[in-house]
């Protein structure tokens, strides 16, 4: 009996987990020239093989580049990477720093990650915008998974079934990649860091190596005026920003300018020469000021020694006897501001200015 309750408890614990694995939410957008975007469970969780199966379940196929460009010209844009035939792309009409690296047009990503959203193409859809609710997954087959279709207007339709034909996609149903960005509040996604990797050859390596090649075009000039980007990793056909301003309803607020941030502005050569001349003039002015101060800073000092001068400056007495001599010496000195000993220039102007009493004796 205890063993029965033990197994029952384990079954109740595992039941929510099994139910979680059997729930799939598919968020879809309006159709533009038959092309629409599908997001699974609010995150990047669709492999390339599952993308083909999912489009097949919607009675659709992966769109080609031409079909994606046509949808773009009708106003279709998102901020989510998704599979098309042979590429992973974002269609952009309005530039945004967090969407397609601020590019416009069909932005093509080359990356080594494996899970994204997907784009699908329904050939029977109207050529213009079509936002009617999708209520069925016509080509799904029997299965235990609860599949819920979430339309842009919020309506939801659920059914039991399965659309995946590859076992590895079923086994890896919980494997997801990090999100790149969110296009609008209606797209259930979380913003996060993402590094773009380019595999195209470049002549000069640059600091921003997050630029896969880029195609922006209109239907009229799609096959003309192809040119290579100066950095070697962008292919521009025409400017996708010339397309109609009408979009799929998920345009972002606070859009940035279409111009890409370039390198640092170069300093004009004439400004460098002018700065050098000013610096040289300043150095010369300082040198002249210091030299003038040294010349004008000389001081003349008059020193009068009364009675006791230096020994070498004294004159030996020519007088005999006990008479003492007193000498006054006047020294005219050039006082230099340096710390060297004072040098004196001595001039004796008076000698023996005394009355000598002589004793006359025999």
UniProtKB/Swiss-Prot annotation:
GO terms for cellular component: apical plasma membrane; basolateral plasma membrane; cell projection; extracellular region; lamellipodium membrane; macrophage migration inhibitory factor receptor complex; microvillus; plasma membrane. It is found in: Cell membrane; Cell projection, Microvillus; Secreted. Residues 181-190 have a biased composition (Low complexity). Residues 23-269 are extracellular. Disulfide bonds join 30-131, 55-120, 79-99. SMART domains: LINK (SM00445). Residues 293-311 are annotated as: Required for interaction with EZR, MSN and RDX and for co-localization to microvilli. It holds the Pfam family Xlink. It is a single-pass type I membrane protein. Induction: By EBV. Residues 1-22 form the signal peptide. Residues 158-169 have a biased composition (Basic and acidic residues). The chain crosses the membrane at residues 270-290. Glycans are attached at residues 27, 59, 102, 112, 122, 174, 182, 256. The keyword Protease does not apply. The modification Phosphoserine is found at residues 292, 306, 317, 326. Residues 226-269 are annotated as: Stem. Residues 233-260 have a biased composition (Polar residues). It comes from the Eukaryota. Residues 34-122 form the Link domain. Hyaluronan binds at residues 43, 80-81, 107. Keywords: Cell adhesion, Cell membrane, Cell projection, Disulfide bond, Glycoprotein, Membrane, Phosphoprotein, Proteoglycan, Receptor, Secreted, Signal, Transmembrane, Transmembrane helix. The lectin-like LINK domain is responsible for hyaluronan binding. Cell-surface receptor that plays a role in cell-cell interactions, as well as cell adhesion and migration, helping them to sense and respond to changes in the tissue microenvironment. Participates thereby in a wide variety of cellular functions including the activation, recirculation and homing of T-lymphocytes, hematopoiesis, inflammation and response to bacterial infection. Interacts with PKN2. Interacts with TIAM1 and TIAM2. Interacts with HA, as well as other glycosaminoglycans, collagen, laminin, and fibronectin via its N-terminal segment. Interacts with UNC119. Interacts with PDPN (via extracellular domain); this interaction is required for PDPN-mediated directional migration and regulation of lamellipodia extension/stabilization during cell spreading and migration. Interacts with RDX, EZR and MSN. Interacts with EGFR. Interacts with CD74; this complex is essential for the MIF-induced signaling cascade that results in B cell survival. This is CD44 antigen. It comes from Cricetulus griseus (Chinese hamster). The lineage of its organism: Eukaryota, Metazoa, Chordata, Craniata, Vertebrata.
């Amino acid at each position: 009996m205890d063993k029965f309750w033990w197994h029952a408890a384990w079954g109740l614990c595992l039941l929510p987990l099994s139910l979680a694995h059997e729930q799939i939410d598919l968020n879809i957008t309006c159709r533009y020239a038959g092309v629409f975007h599908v997001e699974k469970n609010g995150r990047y969780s669709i492999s390339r093989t599952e993308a083909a199966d999912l489009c097949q379940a919607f009675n659709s196929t992966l769109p080609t580049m031409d079909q994606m460009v046509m949808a773009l010209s009708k106003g279709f844009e998102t901020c989510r990477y998704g599979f098309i035939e042979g590429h992973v792309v974002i269609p952009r009409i309005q530039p945004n720093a967090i969407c397609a690296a601020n590019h416009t047009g069909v932005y093509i990503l080359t990356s080594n990650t494996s899970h994204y959203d997907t784009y699908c193409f329904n050939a029977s859809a109207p050529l213009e915008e079509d936002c009617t609710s999708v209520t069925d997954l016509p080509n799904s087959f029997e299965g235990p998974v609860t599949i819920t279709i979430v339309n842009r207007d919020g309506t939801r339709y659920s059914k039991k079934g399965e659309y995946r034909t590859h076992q590895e996609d079923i086994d890896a149903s919980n494997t997801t990649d990090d999100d790149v960005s969110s296009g609008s509040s209606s797209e259930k996604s979380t913003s996060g860091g993402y590094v773009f990797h380019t595999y195209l050859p470049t002549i000069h390596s640059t600091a921003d190596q997050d630029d896969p090649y880029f195609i922006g075009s209109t239907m009229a000039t799609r096959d003309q005026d192809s040119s290579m980007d100066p950095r070697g990793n962008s292919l521009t056909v025409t400017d996708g920003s010339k397309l109609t301003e009408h979009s799929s309803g998920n345009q972002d607020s606070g859009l940035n300018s279409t111009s890409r941030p370039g390198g640092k502005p170069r300093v004009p050569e004439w400004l460098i020469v002018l700065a050098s001349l000013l610096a040289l003039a300043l150095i010369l002015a300082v040198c002249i000021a210091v030299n003038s101060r040294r010349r004008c800073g000389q001081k003349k000092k008059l020193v009068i020694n009364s009675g006791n001068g230096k020994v070498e400056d004294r004159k030996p007495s020519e007088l005999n006897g006990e008479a003492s001599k007193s000498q006054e010496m006047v020294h005219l000195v050039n006082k230099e501001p340096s710390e060297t000993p004072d040098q004196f220039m001595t001039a004796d102007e008076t000698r023996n200015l005394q009355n000598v009493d002589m004793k006359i004796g025999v």
